A protein has these predicted regions:
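Ligand-binding pocket segment of bilobal, Venus flytrap-like solute-binding proteins
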Residues: 195-253
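Bacterial signal peptide processing site
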Residues: 26-29
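Non-catalytic, conformational "gating/processing" segments within enzyme and secreted inhibitor domains
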Residues: 179-203
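N-terminal segment of the mature folded domain
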Residues: 39-174, 238, 249-252
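Surface-exposed, Gly/Pro/Thr- and Asp/Glu-enriched linker/hinge segments
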Residues: 118-129, 169-188, 218-225, 230-231
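Bacterial N-terminal signal peptides that target proteins for export
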Residues: 1-12
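General small-molecule cofactor/ligand-binding pocket signal
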Residues: 84-88, 190, 227
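C-terminal motif of bacterial Sec signal peptides marking the signal peptidase cleavage site
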Residues: 19-24
Length: 253
């Protein structure tokens, strides 16, 4: 999706749909129950009706809106309980979960191979589970004064984020937007500066859809082009304030 930011920039379409997972400890077989919780009132779920205090999690900023909603519903279901979530990024969330600082992590990417064993130790010898939790479409969003709609092919998107296309009236963009009056405004790339599952999913998509134009992968986005901002809200806010700005972000922002 290509989206024009006005505080919704402009989404050029969903380019990747990330399945954001919740990473948490499993129970031992001795501690497991056969109670089905789907649609069951909190008061009828064994051990839940007496729950109180704060459940603390950390991780993907793309999950912040969902976590805010879950907190409201959790408090409605369980009197005296609440959910606190710090949107520090997928990488930080997984690290602090493995370190025992939070009860769960929200992440757009699974635990790395070298985190699996420490996570099991942190969970008292039980496996850390990856539970599909939130579907977060990743969008390419731009802010370009006077231009409400744009079409950009995936190779063109890749070349923009690599710095090979640097002006909004570049012939490659013009060829894909016949009849659109494009200004000669410089393109300002904004990327996630923190370790991010959104960066990971976006780069995986570019590699798969435009392999000749994008080579890098991973949760750390290349910093050679543009400027970085922390978190989904950070990149969205930055592009909102820059005429000619472009970023990738979970579409809810």
């Amino acid at each position: 999706m290509i989206r024009n930011f006005k505080r919704t920039a402009a989404i050029l379409g969903v380019v990747a749909a990330g399945s954001a997972a919740l990473v948490a400890c499993s129970e031992s077989e001795e501690g497991s129950t056969d109670t089905a919780t789907n649609g069951t009132p909190a008061a009828e779920v064994e051990g839940l009706s007496g729950t109180a205090g704060q459940l603390v999690g950390e991780g993907a900023s793309s999950q912040q809106n969902a976590m805010d909603y879950f907190n409201v519903k959790y408090q409605e279901a369980v009197s005296g309980a609440s959910l606190a979530y710090t949107a520090s990024g997928s990488g930080s969330g997984r690290t602090n979960f493995v370190g025992g600082q939070v009860a769960f992590a929200g992440s757009d990417s699974p635990l790395s191979e070298d985190q699996v064993e420490p996570a099991a130790e942190r969970c008292g010898g039980n496996d850390a589970w990856h539970l599909p939790f939130v579907i977060g479409p990743v969008a390419v969003a731009y802010n370009l004064e006077g231009v409400e709609e744009l079409n950009l092919s995936i190779p063109t998107v890749a070349k923009i984020f690599k710095g090979e296309i640097t002006s909004w009236n570049d012939e490659a963009i013009a060829a894909e937007n016949e009849g659109v009056e494009l200004p000669d405004t410089n393109i300002s790339v904004v990327y996630r500066s923190d370790e991010s599952g959104t960066s990971d999913n976006f780069q995986k998509f570019l590699q798969a859809a435009a392999p000749e134009d994008w080579e890098t992968d991973g949760q750390q986005f290349p910093s050679a082009v543009g400027e970085g901002a922390n978190g989904s809200n950070g990149v969205a806010t930055q592009v909102t304030n820059i005429d000619g700005g472009i970023t990738y972000v979970e579409s809810g922002f």
